[in-house]
A protein has these predicted regions:
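Positively charged, low-complexity terminal tracts
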Residues: 1-76
Length: 76
């Protein structure tokens, strides 16, 4: 699992195609009792283990605040 503490901008020259997958989220408390956002994605049907958990990212409160600001700025 990845613990995301901050986000850094990276410009992409071009965006390639992506496959659609299932995604879930959970609101959990870390060991210090702070609320975190966890996002999990699950393997596409073409993978060796279809539907198995593929990626897991847990966002700290600081990363959540940064993500919120990015969304408000770019996706009004």
């Amino acid at each position: 699992m990845a613990l995301v503490r901050s986000l850094r901008h990276l410009s992409m020259e071009k965006a390639g195609p992506h496959l659609a997958v299932e995604c879930t989220y959970s609101i959990i408390r870390d060991l210090d009792g702070r609320l975190c956002l966890q996002i999990d994605t699950y393997g596409s049907t073409g993978r060796k283990v279809p539907g198995g958990k593929s990626q897991s990212m847990r966002f700290t409160p600081e990363a959540i605040a940064q993500l919120r600001s990015l969304l408000e700025t770019h996706f009004r």
